[in-house]
């Protein structure tokens, strides 16, 4: 050979180089060398050489198979064609350029094509798809003109499928057009007449199918607005033929597609040059459409670019209707035209339109004469669709309307069907669906099919479902259809609507009791709404609060007299996705019955179609999905809604949602809201002023977040916010439950703070708009008492905020209005401050006396009740202490006589003393001065619980000598608590004078009594509220709250008495019990997680999980707060636990009081505390427990510095890398990097052997994936690990008996900034790590499964590949019994460990343990690699095992 350039060409590595860049013909250095290189290249010798190379095990991985003979010749011909100077050469020019071209291949081997004619025959056959893909993709990506010249020369000889493949690559890679794409499209069109017809087809049913399948078609040019490409593909001759055959295609669908993609260039061409050309040729324009209809369709998709084109073409001020404020409709015109009529009909229609226009002009003149001085506004009314594509176009579209003086009105709706035009796009879709709807089922049929529906739905987990469900529990008033919303895509076959069940719906399952929603709602929906069988339901609840409220506000579905309301607590939303099996396109269905759709005279015959026409199921697909949904639900609700006799049918026709409501309440598109408000108010227009009603304002004011605040500011900018509601005339400031909103209204009108309101009206308006539920007043007893009073109750703003505990609003009013007053004292309590505020600022001072007297009345009733209760207790005490007295009264009361006989004990005096003390204390507390703060709701709840305890607690047993001794030892009695303050009785100490004593409750139950100073904790009621919340929950991993008492200076809490703490267990040993004795093994002697240790760790994790599920942050976790009870860990010291909500931020401002070193950097820097604080502390505690008392940030004196500088020291835990990986994530300095409590439980640290086997199976399935998810890059990643050179764990000292580098920690945190290096995970082949006896029989077993004979042995594993190691483990687990039998039958030899191998093959768990011992870090290594590098598609294999 002269050189080896051609040889390089046929190596796959060289093909990869071609793909990545460079011209195909650049492989040949000089043009003259092209022929010589091809002539001197022997293809046969090359293939024989490569086959020999492939057999060499040292080079087999680097020597892929050679390309096929056809691709070999094809690439050479592309290179030859690239040397021709003509832009579009043909075969003759090719032969002329290479005059020896017919003999080019004669010098090659006999198997190679020896002539051009034979090569043309080869082109007409199927070419290898993968190698053809390399050529097509590389040529089009590089925009290599050689491929254009090749197709120009030889495209006519290629098989149609090969040409279509080039078109598909064009469709997927080409976006905006350029000269290369146009030239390539031209040669594709010219290459085959058949393919040309394929490209220029205009039947929308076929276009939809081709586009969904990835073929090049007209939709590509429309999507990217490629005008020149559109001209090449658009051929309206087929439409002309269809017109002659009375199969005219409705142009509205075509324009709808254009508006969907906002293709303004194509629209401008069709409205100008194309229209002029049709007129010059005296041809009918098949795309002719009314300008108003076209603007309505553009509005439907918010096509701002097309709107600009339309306003440049038409004068819409003459076409659109006009409105005025006083006279509703000034001018109306026909907005749509009927394209089904012939030319004669069109002429007649034109004449009629002219007459109508004349009449309209006359009417206008008359109206104008009657309405002189009224301002008329040109308005646009229509429908809109908001989805991913259109959402960003709302603002620019409305801006275009505003610039052209077009006003939007409140008649712009989302889902109304009632007033649709006769031949509008909505009617086309809806009527067609009605024709093809299947016959609905009656109630009996539904009842029969309910169990089938219940078990047929594969998308729902049935494990927790009851066997029977009452299918008749739901009536019509409980099906509250809320609204319809949609995301559109031609390629995604799915539709969505949301349903909400009413408050009356109930279910007996546990899920419903806990969350007020359950899976059975799905089946009721299936049962009653006759959802198509090929649909399935997905539960969806991820809505913001403002979305939930706004959806509720739009309920208007029934004409029944009673209102139907839901609340956010009871709403359940459903998402229905359809994957129909039918291949019928919606466009095909429309076209097949187009005349019937558009003929208004056939409306009465819609349900009398032939059965054959109903066989093809309507395919719910594309941008018409919402329209089909509307009609489908409307159809079912009107004709198939049979919940009972005499029920008024729910009509979907009444459901609508206004565009303004959508932008104001649901969308977070502030720019669009600003544009629509600007449009509403341009030129002083007030047509839509009534859109801002009480409903909108109350939703925004009552649920004020960052977005709603800006929306209110925008409203106030264009339409000043009213001071009061329209219906009740209540000041809106009374609904401002946040400081930001309060400031806004005070800025609008400072005098609003002097307003008062009737509480009955306030509650009524909150109830009417579903802003509160039936349990609202239960949380505010004082409000409840006012509301239950028949008298008119007036209240002030300050008093309302005080009763509702709105501290931020109260503080703002104090700072703004009261602090500047010299006589105001900041030491007053809230009640006194309220009285002071009302004295100075209320306009109607008479309400002060009324409110004061009412509160005094409530306090007096409470005082009398307590006195009565105290007298009853004293009388019982006298009976017990004085038997004679009780005897004298026996005649009048037999029950008293019985009490006297059984109560004669020597300890009655003590009982009397302890009973009297708490009663006196309680009385003193509750009968305070009139100015004292009223009893809080929490106190009321506590007292109710106390009453329950007193009623249900049996009388104490007779006192014994031991009991008397206990009572004598506890010399202090506070209510039901008894204890003493001796040093040996102190269990613990905290900050601010907090002490914990050992004592008893109810004279017999041992408890820990926590004493807290009131002066240091004025918000102690908040802590009690948290404890009560936890007491009502069933959790065994936290300390239980028992009771609460108080005296003048302290509050006493009774808690579970525990055996000790983790700190004492580790550092001192509780009750002579060491940590080793408590665990049952030496924690420093094993690298494995002992089951006892794992259960104790889970105790801590489950306790924190419970708190976080309740929205509570402990905030002070440390070993001292991990207590021991019944040999388990429980969490204590919830004194700083707070609800994790914004309103309680002021209660978490104080620094934590726990030990140093167990709080993250954000706490040390006094930043906001979230649940991640507990995650950090728990990570430190787990390290403390697993290392026997050491800290992950070193010695006590350096911990704070190491925490702030993020320098953990994990060396003591190097023997347990799985735990080390988990803890390293939990103690990250960046709180966003810490896992949630749910993700912690999914970490491999908590995996049992079943999950580990599941992970191995999932890994193997990924390795065998046929869709290319497991790439060579990923294979390389799992064979190497990235080692951080700054790692705190010394890898050289790690457990590495098998020479495996165990340093896999920080794989998730490497930033590849030069401080990391890649080393093999396996430092030696893994077959050297496993017993040879085992590996030999594993291979033998696999050979048997693969059908290999006994005399042959095939090595089926690569021992340097991690994926093969995983495969070996999985195969051993799967066939462990068979392998064990083979090992048992094999002869023994000296030195082998046959018995050890047999033992490890007893079960899958033992097999897994064997491999974990041999390769200890494999699962963690793979887990980290997959979590870091896999995409969402690949993670599907792992389900819930890996969550990023």
UniProtKB/Swiss-Prot annotation:
Matching entries from PROSITE patterns are given as: KEN (PS51392), PROTEIN_KINASE_DOM (PS50011), ZF_SWIM (PS50966)
Domain annotation KEN: ranges: 1279-1444
Q: What is its EC number?
A: 2.7.11.1
Pfam families associated with the record: Pkinase, Ribonuc_2-5A
ZnF region ranges: SWIM-type: 495-529
Which sequence ranges form a coiled-coil region, renumbered to this chain?
593-620, 847-879
Q: What is this protein called?
A: Probable serine/threonine-protein kinase irlC
What organism is the protein native to?
Dictyostelium discoideum (Social amoeba)
């Amino acid at each position: 050979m002269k050189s080896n350039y051609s040889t390089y060409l046929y190596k796959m590595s060289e093909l990869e180089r071609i793909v990545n860049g460079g011209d195909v013909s650049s492989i040949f250095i000089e043009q003259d060398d092209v022929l010589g290189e091809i002539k001197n290249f022997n293809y046969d010798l090359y293939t024989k050489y490569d086959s020999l190379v492939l057999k060499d095990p040292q080079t087999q991985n680097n020597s892929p198979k050679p390309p096929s003979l056809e691709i070999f010749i094809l690439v050479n011909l592309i290179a030859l064609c690239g040397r021709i100077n003509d832009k579009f050469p043909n075969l003759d020019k090719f032969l002329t350029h290479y005059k020896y071209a017919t003999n080019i291949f004669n010098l090659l081997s006999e198997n190679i094509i020896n002539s051009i004619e034979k090569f043309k025959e080869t082109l007409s056959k199927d070419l290898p798809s993968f190698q053809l893909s390399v050529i097509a993709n590389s040529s089009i990506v590089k925009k290599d003109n050689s491929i254009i010249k090749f197709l120009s020369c030889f495209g006519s000889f290629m098989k149609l499928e090969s040409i279509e493949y080039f078109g598909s690559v064009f469709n997927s890679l080409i976006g905006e057009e350029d000269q290369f794409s146009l030239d390539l499209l031209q040669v594709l069109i010219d290459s085959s007449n058949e393919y040309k017809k394929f490209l220029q087809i205009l039947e929308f049913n076929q276009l939809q199918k081709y586009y969904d399948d990835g073929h090049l078609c007209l939709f590509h040019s429309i999507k990217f607005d490629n005008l020149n490409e559109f001209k090449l593909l658009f051929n309206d001759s087929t439409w002309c033929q269809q017109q002659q055959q009375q199969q005219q295609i409705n142009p509205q669908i075509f324009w709808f597609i254009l508006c969907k993609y906002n293709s303004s260039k194509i629209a401008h061409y069709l409205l100008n040059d194309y229209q002029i050309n049709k007129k010059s040729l005296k041809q009918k324009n098949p795309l002719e459409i009314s300008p108003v209809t076209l603007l309505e369709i553009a509005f439907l998709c918010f096509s701002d670019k097309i709107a600009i084109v339309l306003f440049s073409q038409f004068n819409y001020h003459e076409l659109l209707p006009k409105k005025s404020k006083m006279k509703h409709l000034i001018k109306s015109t026909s907005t749509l035209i009927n394209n089904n009529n012939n030319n004669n009909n069109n002429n007649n229609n034109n004449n009629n339109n002219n007459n109508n226009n004349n009449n309209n002009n006359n009417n206008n003149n008359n109206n104008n004469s009657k309405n002189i001085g009224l301002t008329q506004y040109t308005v646009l009314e229509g429908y809109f669709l908001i989805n991913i594509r259109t959402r960003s176009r709302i603002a620019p579209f409305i801006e275009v309307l505003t610039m052209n003086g077009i006003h939007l009105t409140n008649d712009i709706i989302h889902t109304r069907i009632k007033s649709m035009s006769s031949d509008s796009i909505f009617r086309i879709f809806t009527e067609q669906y009605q024709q093809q709807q299947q016959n609905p089922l009656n109630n009996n049929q539904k009842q029969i099919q309910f169990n089938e529906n219940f078990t047929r739905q594969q998308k729902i987990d049935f494990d927790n479902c009851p066997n029977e469900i009452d299918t008749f529990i739901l009536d019509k008033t409980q099906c509250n259809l809320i609204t319809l919303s949609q995301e559109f895509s031609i390629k995604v076959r799915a539709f969505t609507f949301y349903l909400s069940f009413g408050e009356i719906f109930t279910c007996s399952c546990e899920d419903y009791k806990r969350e007020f929603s359950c899976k059975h709602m799905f089946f009721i929906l299936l049962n009653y709404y006759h959802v198509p069988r090929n649909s399935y339901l997905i539960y969806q609840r991820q809505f913001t609060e403002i979305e939930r409220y706004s959806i509720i506000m739009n309920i208007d579905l029934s004409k029944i007299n009673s209102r139907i309301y839901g609340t956010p607590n009871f709403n359940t939303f459903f998402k229905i996705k359809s994957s129909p099996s039918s291949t019928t396109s919606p466009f095909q269905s429309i076209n097949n019955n187009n005349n019937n759709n558009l003929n208004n005279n056939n409306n009465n015959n819609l349900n009398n179609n032939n059965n054959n026409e109903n066989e093809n199921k309507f395919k719910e697909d594309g941008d018409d999905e919402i329209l089909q949904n509307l009609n489908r639900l409307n159809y079912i609700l009107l004709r198939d809604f049979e919940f009972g006799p005499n029920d008024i049918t729910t009509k979907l026709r009444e459901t609508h949602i206004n565009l303004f409501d959508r932008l104001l309440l649901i969308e977070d598109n502030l720019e669009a809201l600003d544009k629509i408000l600007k449009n509403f108010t341009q030129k002083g227009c007030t047509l839509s002023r009534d859109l801002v009603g009480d409903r909108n304002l109350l939703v925004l004011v009552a649920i004020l977040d960052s977005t709603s605040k800006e929306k209110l500011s925008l409203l106030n900018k264009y339409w000043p916010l009213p001071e009061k509601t329209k219906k009740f005339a209540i000041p809106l400031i009374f609904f401002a439950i946040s400081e930001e909103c309060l400031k806004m209204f005070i800025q609008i009108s400072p005098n609003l703070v002097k307003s008062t309101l009737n509480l009955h009206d306030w509650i009524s308006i909150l109830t009417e708009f579903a802003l509160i539920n039936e349990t609202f007043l239960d949380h505010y007893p004082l409000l409840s008492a006012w509301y239950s009073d028949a008298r008119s109750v007036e209240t002030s703003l300050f008093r309302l905020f005080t009763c509702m505990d709105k501290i931020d609003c109260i503080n703002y009013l104090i700072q703004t209005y009261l602090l500047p007053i010299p006589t105001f004292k900041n030491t007053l309590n809230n009640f006194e401050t309220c009285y002071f505020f009302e004295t100075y600022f209320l306009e109607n001072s008479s309400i002060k006396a009324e409110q004061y007297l009412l509160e005094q009345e409530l306090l007096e009733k409470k005082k009398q009740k307590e006195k009565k209760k105290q007298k009853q207790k004293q009388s019982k005490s006298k009976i017990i202490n004085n038997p004679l007295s009780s005897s004298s009264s026996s005649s009048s009361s037999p029950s008293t006589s019985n009490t006297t006989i059984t109560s004669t004990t020597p300890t009655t005096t003590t009982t009397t003393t302890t009973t009297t003390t708490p009663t006196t204390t309680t009385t003193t507390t509750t009968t305070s001065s009139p100015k004292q703060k009223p009893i809080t709701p929490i106190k009321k709840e506590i007292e109710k619980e106390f009453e329950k305890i007193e009623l249900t607690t049996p009388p104490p047993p007779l006192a014994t000598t031991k009991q008397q001794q206990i009572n004598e030892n506890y010399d202090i009695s506070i209510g039901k608590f008894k204890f003493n303050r001796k040093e040996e009785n102190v269990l613990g100490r905290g900050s601010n004078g907090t002490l914990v004593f050992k004592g008893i409750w109810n004279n017999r139950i041992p408890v820990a009594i926590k004493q807290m100073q009131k002066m240091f904790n004025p918000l102690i009621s908040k802590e009690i509220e948290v404890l009560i919340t936890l007491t009502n929950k069933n959790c065994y991993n936290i300390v239980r709250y028992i009771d609460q008492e108080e005296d003048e200076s302290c509050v006493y809490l009774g808690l579970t008495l525990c055996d000790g703490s983790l700190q004492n267990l580790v550092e001192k040993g509780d009750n002579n019990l060491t940590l080793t004795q408590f665990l049952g093994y030496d924690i420093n002697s094993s690298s494995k997680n002992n089951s006892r240790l794992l259960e104790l760790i889970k105790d801590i994790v489950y306790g924190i999980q419970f708190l976080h599920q309740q929205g509570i942050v402990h905030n002070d976790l440390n070993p001292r707060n991990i207590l021991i009870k019944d040999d388990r860990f429980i969490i204590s010291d919830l004194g700083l636990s707070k609800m994790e909500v914004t309103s309680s931020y002021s209660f978490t401002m104080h620094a934590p009081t726990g030990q140093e070193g167990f709080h993250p950097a954000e706490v040390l820097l006094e930043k906001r505390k979230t649940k991640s604080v507990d995650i950090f502390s728990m990570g430190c505690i787990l390290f403390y427990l697993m290392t026997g008392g050491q800290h992950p940030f070193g010695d006590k004196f350096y911990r704070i510095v190491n925490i702030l500088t993020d320098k953990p020291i994990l060396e003591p835990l190097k023997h347990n890398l799985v735990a080390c990986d988990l803890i390293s994530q939990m103690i990250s300095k960046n709180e966003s990097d810490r896992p949630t409590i749910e993700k912690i439980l999914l970490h491999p640290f908590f995996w049992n052997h079943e999950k580990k086997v599941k992970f191995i199976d999932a890994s193997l399935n990924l390795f065998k994936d046929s869709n290319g998810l497991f790439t060579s890059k990923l294979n390389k990643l799992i064979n190497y690990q990235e080692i951080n050179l700054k790692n705190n764990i010394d890898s050289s000292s790690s457990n590495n008996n098998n020479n495996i580098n165990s340093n896999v920690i920080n794989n998730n945190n490497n930033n590849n900034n030069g401080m990391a290096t890649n080393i093999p995970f396996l430092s030696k082949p893994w077959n050297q790590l496993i017993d040879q006896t085992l590996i030999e029989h594993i291979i033998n077993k696999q050979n048997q499964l693969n059908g290999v004979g006994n005399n042959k042995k095939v090595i089926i594993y690569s021992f340097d590949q991690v994926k093969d190691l995983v495969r070996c483990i999985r195969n051993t687990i799967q066939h462990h019994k068979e392998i064990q039998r083979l090992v048992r039958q094999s002869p023994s030899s000296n030195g082998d460990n046959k018995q050890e191998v047999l033992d490890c093959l007893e079960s899958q768990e033992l097999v897994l343990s064997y491999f974990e011992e041999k390769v200890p870090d494999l699962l963690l290594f793979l887990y980290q690699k997959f979590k870091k590098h896999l995409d969402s598609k690949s993670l599907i294999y792992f389900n819930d095992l890996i969550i990023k």
